[in-house]
């Protein structure tokens, strides 16, 4: 590589195979690569069962793995402590949302407020030209001079849903080295290079709830016995009682403790009234949704956008019409009714492979 193309790049290293391969590839391309891991949560209070490890990211074991990979490929490595900021910007929001009767997505908030804000700022302090991550997503510069965010080439691993909040300035300073690869290719590259994390499993749980017990975590944060109340149907008929609205999410069927001739699902959570609203499966259907904090990767042309949208990560995109409002909100109408529109989750707008933007689901239509 010619010297003029050599860049200083900070790579966010989670200790997993993806960011490890991304770091190795950037180093092989001749760049000056600096590895950084984020310390965002104190795991001292969590002990995995003997002989087991939590399937999460950002643990001390993961940071140790990242450090060893950095040593193996020959790049400097640092740990930045964002515990205080992560608590304020991600965890407190997560807890608040549940106690408002919503179901949050902390991974999007982490990308928005920590990784592509605080860590990107840290990269700039180090004089880096770019921040690189192991996300399966693509970033291209169009003929219009603007940066466009695209799905990762591997449909099974595409993570563009979690990145819809990225701005033009952030995209201009971000690299996704794995965007054109499949997971199988990444593992093969790791094995070929003898990276010690080549066969490491993928993180499955939220980093600060490593045992996946949300109820325990929320009650430790706010106390037990809060938000208990009635389970009702759409007409207000009382069908039972519950131990806390934060224990329920739209679409949930198990754990209701109600004897009923037909299957019942959670169709709404009213935290203010401390009510969990249930109904048959057809009551989960919605013709659309309202969204707040709507942001656009590239500003839309006009007040109406024809797109496809995902209302949760593993949801297949569905055709929709987005009515853009001046206050930063939007009204989204589906072509066909969709199930389980969940307040607090992200709705992300696509056109083919391109991420147009997204927002946070406020309610259903």
UniProtKB/Swiss-Prot annotation:
Annotated positions for site Interaction with tRNA: 135, 345
Task: State any GO BP term from the record.
Answer: tRNA wobble position uridine thiolation
Q: Localized where?
A: Cytoplasm
Cystine crosslinks: 110-207
Name the residues annotated as catalytic in the UniProt entry: 110 (nucleophile), 207 (cysteine persulfide intermediate)
Residue numbers binding ATP: 12-19, 38, 134
- MF annotations from Gene Ontology: ATP binding; tRNA binding; tRNA-uridine 2-sulfurtransferase activity
Q: What class of enzyme is it?
A: transferase
UniProt main location, coarse: cytoplasm
User: EC no.?
Assistant: 2.8.1.13
- Tell whether tRNA processing is among the UniProt keywords: yes
- Which InterPro entries does the entry link to? MnmA-like, MnmA-like_C, MnmA-like_central, MnmA-like_central_sf, Rossmann-like_a/b/a_fold
Report the GO terms under cellular component: cytoplasm
Pfam families assigned: tRNA_Me_trans, tRNA_Me_trans_C, tRNA_Me_trans_M
What the record says about family reads: Belongs to the MnmA/TRMU family.
Q: What is this protein called?
A: tRNA-specific 2-thiouridylase MnmA
Q: Which organism is it from?
A: Geobacter sulfurreducens (strain ATCC 51573 / DSM 12127 / PCA)
């Amino acid at each position: 590589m010619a010297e003029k193309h050599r860049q200083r790049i900070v790579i966010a290293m989670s200790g997993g195979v993806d960011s490890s391969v991304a770091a190795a590839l950037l180093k092989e391309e001749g760049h000056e690569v600096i590895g950084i891991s984020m310390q965002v949560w104190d795991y001292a209070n969590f002990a995995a069962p003997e002989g087991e490890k939590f399937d999460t990211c950002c643990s001390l074991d993961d940071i140790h793995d990242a450090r060893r990979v950095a040593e193996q490929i020959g790049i400097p490595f640092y740990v930045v402590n964002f515990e205080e900021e992560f608590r304020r910007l991600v965890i407190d929001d997560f807890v608040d949302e549940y106690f408002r009767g919503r179901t949050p997505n902390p991974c999007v908030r982490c990308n928005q407020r920590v990784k592509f804000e605080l860590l990107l700022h840290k990269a700039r302090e180090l004089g880096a030209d770019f921040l690189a991550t192991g996300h399966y997503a693509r970033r291209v510069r169009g003929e219009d001079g603007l940066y466009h965010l695209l799905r990762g080439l591997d449909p099974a691993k595409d993570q563009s849903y979690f990145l819809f909040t990225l701005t033009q300035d952030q995209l201009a300073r971000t690299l996704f080295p794995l965007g054109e690869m499949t997971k199988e290719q990444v593992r093969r590259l790791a094995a070929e290079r003898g990276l010690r994390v080549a066969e490491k499993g993928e993180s499955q749980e939220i980093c600060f709830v490593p045992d996946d017990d949300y109820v325990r975590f929320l009650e430790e944060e706010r106390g037990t016995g809060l938000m208990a109340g009635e389970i009702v149907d759409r007409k207000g008929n009382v069908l039972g009682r519950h131990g806390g609205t934060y224990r329920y999410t739209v679409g949930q069927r198990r754990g209701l403790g109600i004897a009923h001739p037909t299957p019942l699902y959670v169709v709404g959570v009213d935290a203010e009234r401390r009510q969990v609203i249930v109904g048959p499966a057809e009551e989960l259907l919605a013709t659309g949704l309202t969204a707040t904090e709507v942001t656009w990767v590239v500003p839309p042309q006009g007040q109406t956008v024809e797109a496809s949208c995902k209302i949760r990560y593993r949801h297949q995109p569905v055709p929709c019409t987005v009515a853009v409002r001046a206050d930063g909100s939007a009204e989204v109408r589906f072509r066909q009714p969709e199930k389980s529109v969940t307040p607090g989750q992200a709705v992300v707008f696509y056109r083919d492979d391109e991420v147009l933007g997204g927002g946070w689901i406020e309610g259903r239509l």
